[in-house]
Swiss-Prot record:
Keyword field contains Kinase: no
Family listed: To M.jannaschii MJ0084 and MJ0685.
Protein's organism: Methanocaldococcus jannaschii (strain ATCC 43067 / DSM 2661 / JAL-1 / JCM 10045 / NBRC 100440) (Methanococcus jannaschii)
GO molecular function: ATP binding; ATP hydrolysis activity
Phylogenetic classification of the source organism: Archaea, Methanobacteriati, Methanobacteriota, Methanomada group, Methanococci
Protein name in the entry: Uncharacterized ATP-binding protein MJ0823
Binding site for ATP: G7, K8, G9, G10, V11, G12, K13, T14
Length: 257
């Protein structure tokens, strides 16, 4: 199962992504969690305080695999570098979860064809197409950073929103992107919700997006406390229990595809 989690910055993508990873692990799955955000914080959601150097900053590996130094243009380098062993080489293990921090490509802008971008994109494609583990991608708000074709074969795209107009606008953009890419399974998670607002939000999302709401994750002070302290959320918390319902939906989807 390959899942991309998207949405506007600050809506809680990383919290939801990390909780889903833990639920998959709890139920016996091996998981690869990929932090695709230029400001990587996925490891913090697991209580990892030590710095994990993003792959985009591992100049030694980039040069070893592509034959060219990062930041170089016009040079000859491999466009199909070996990536199948990189998960073991650069991944950070937490039980049966392996975290992979991709980092950002600062040179060349969108769509740059440079050694770092070639390596990162090829690795993402490998994770989605070749690996047997559950792969969960914690994406940035706009995935153009890695190129649209990197995620066109995911099994499910989850769009996380909060009760704001800005996040709804981003959700519309992500829905269009998913449709353009031919991603068939698409759902919405509404985060930071008050119980009394659920029906109103459900109606608005149906009208504005035409998508199914897979879950309403409540505003939960335990989430705020855990994020402030840099500790994983208690899986018995109100928010985690709602995410567990979403997990159960994903398992049903997995068993029918």
């Amino acid at each position: 199962m390959k899942i991309a989690i998207t949405g506007k910055g600050g809506v809680g993508k990383t919290f939801i992504a990390s909780t889903l990873m833990r639920l998959f692990e709890k139920n016996g799955f091996k998981v690869i969690g990929v932090d695709c955000d230029p400001n990587p914080t996925l490891a913090l959601a697991f209580g990892v305080e030590e710095e994990i150097v993003p792959l985009s900053k591992r100049h030694d590996i980039i040069e070893e695999r592509t034959g060219a130094k990062p930041g170089t243009y016009g040079n000859i380098f491999k466009i199909n570098p070996k990536v199948d062993d990189l998960i073991d080489k650069v991944g950070y293990k937490i039980g049966n979860i392996t975290l992979l921090v991709m980092g950002t490509i600062e040179e060349g802008g969108e769509g740059c064809v440079c050694p770092a971008s070639v390596l990162l994109r090829r690795l993402l494609r490998h994770l989605i197409l070749k690996r047997d583990e559950v792969v969960i991608l914690d994406m940035e708000a706009g995935i153009e950073h890695f190129g649209r074709k990197t995620i066109d074969t995911v099994d499910l795209m989850l769009i996380v929103i909060e009760p704001t107009k800005k996040s709804l606008i981003t959700a519309k953009r992500m829905k269009k992107l998913a449709n353009d890419l031919g991603i068939k399974n698409l759902g919405v998670i509404v985060n930071k919700v008050r119980n009394e607002d659920k029906e109103l939000l459900k109606d608005i999302i149906k009208e504005e997006l035409g998508l199914e709401v897979l879950g309403f994750v409540p505003y939960d002070e335990e989430v705020i406390k855990s994020e402030f302290l840099g500790k994983p959320i208690n899986l018995d918390s109100k928010a985690a229990k709602e995410i567990e319902k979403i997990f159960n939906y994903i398992i049903k989807l997995k068993n029918t595809t």
